[in-house]
Amino acid sequence: MKRKVMLTGDRPTGALHLGHYVGSVVNRLKFQEEYETYFIIADLHTLTTKPDLKSINTIPSNVREMVLDYLACGINPDKVSIYLQSAIPELFELHLIFSMIVTVARLQRIPSIKDMSIAAGLKEIPYGLLGYPVLMSADILMTKANLVPVGRDNESHIEFARELARRFNHLYKNNFFPIPESVFTDSRPLVGIYGKNKMSKSLDNAIFLNDDENLLEKKIMSMYTDPNRIRADIPGNVEGNPIFIYHSFFNSNHEEVEDLKSRYKKGKVGDVEVKKKLFLALNSFLKPIRDKRSFYEAKKKDYIDEIIFDGTSKARFIANKVVKDVKDLIGLSKTWNGIKYSAEKKLKNEE
C-alpha cells in the first residue's frame, strides 16, 4: 500500500536548539519511519519578514548548519527528501495560480499574519507576508501532502490550505489535490534559559544542540529558577521552573528527578546541585548528537550540498508534473501548446 505523504520543514535560521528538538525533531524521527516525508527548507518564507540583504546573505550557511543538525539527530536522507524552497521555480507558478482564487479579505482574517508582522517589527504588512498562507498552501499541495505536523496555534494555516484545495477542486471540477490533514504534535514551546519567553536564537536564551560541554555548563549554571527562593533552605516552586522543565524532558533518571523535585519543594536542596545534575543529564543527552555532527562535518565538503541537491531534484520532478497537470486542468496550456505545435510543424515542413 502506498504510504501517505507528509510535509514538514523550517525556515533556515541556522543551528538547531533544544526548543527545535522538543517541538519538532523528536516527532520527525517517528514520521520518517511511517510516511513518505519531505522536509522543506523554507527560505522564501524568510523573505516575508526579513527581505534585507544582511538576512538573505546568512541563508547559505544557515541551511547547511540546520541540515547538519537534522542528520546529527538521526534524520535519514535515505528516508526523507530535504529540499530548498527557492530552487523550485514551479512553486512560484503554483503560488501565482492559487493567488488568483483567494480574496484579500480572507487573508486578512488569518490572525497569525498580524502577529508575525508585530513580532518582526513591521509597521505595515507587506504583500508577501499577507500572502504567506498562499505560499504555504502551494508548498503543501505541490507535494500532494496528506499530512502536515502543526502546533494548535498555527492550525489556521492548514485549514486555509484545505480550503484552497477544496476551492481549486470545485472550480475546475476535479479532485486533483488531496485535502491535507493536520497532525498535532501537542508539544508546548520550550521556555528559554532565562524563563518567560520561549527558547529562541534571536532572544539569546537558547541551548544549541552543538554547544560544547563548557558552554553548556555555563548556560545551565546561569539559568533562571524560582525568584522567591533566596536560600537553599527555603521551599521552592517546581511548577513552571525552567530547571525542572528541562529535567523532565532530558533527564532519563526519573527517580532522580522526582527526588530533586521533592527536596526542592521542602527546601532541602540548593539550586547549584539541581543545576549540576541537569548539566550531567543534558550533556549525556547531547553528546551523541555532537559526536554525530562531528562525524558529518568531517565528511567531504559537499556532502550536505549533495543531500540537499538530491532532495531538491526529487521535489522539483514532482513539482514539474503537478504544475503541468494544473495548467492542463485549468486550460492554461492550450494557447501555448497550440502556438508551439504550429511553429514546430512549420519548422519541420521547411527542413
Swiss-Prot record:
GO terms for biological process: tryptophanyl-tRNA aminoacylation. Its EC number is 6.1.1.2. Keywords: Aminoacyl-tRNA synthetase, ATP-binding, Cytoplasm, Ligase, Nucleotide-binding, Protein biosynthesis. A motif ('KMSKS' region) lies at residues 198-202. It is an enzyme of class 6 (ligase). Pfam families: tRNA-synt_1b. InterPro entries: aa-tRNA-synth_I_CS (IPR001412), aa-tRNA-synth_Ic (IPR002305), Rossmann-like_a/b/a_fold (IPR014729), Trp-tRNA-ligase (IPR002306), Trp-tRNA-ligase_bac-type (IPR024109), Trp-tRNA_synthetase (IPR050203). One of its GO terms (cellular component) is cytosol. GO terms for molecular function: ATP binding; tryptophan-tRNA ligase activity. A motif ('HIGH' region) lies at residues 12-20. L-tryptophan binds at residue 139. It is found in: Cytoplasm. ATP binds at residues 11-13, 19-20, 151-153, 190, 198-202. Homodimer. Belongs to the class-I aminoacyl-tRNA synthetase family. Catalyzes the attachment of tryptophan to tRNA(Trp). This is Tryptophan--tRNA ligase. It comes from Borreliella burgdorferi (strain ATCC 35210 / DSM 4680 / CIP 102532 / B31).
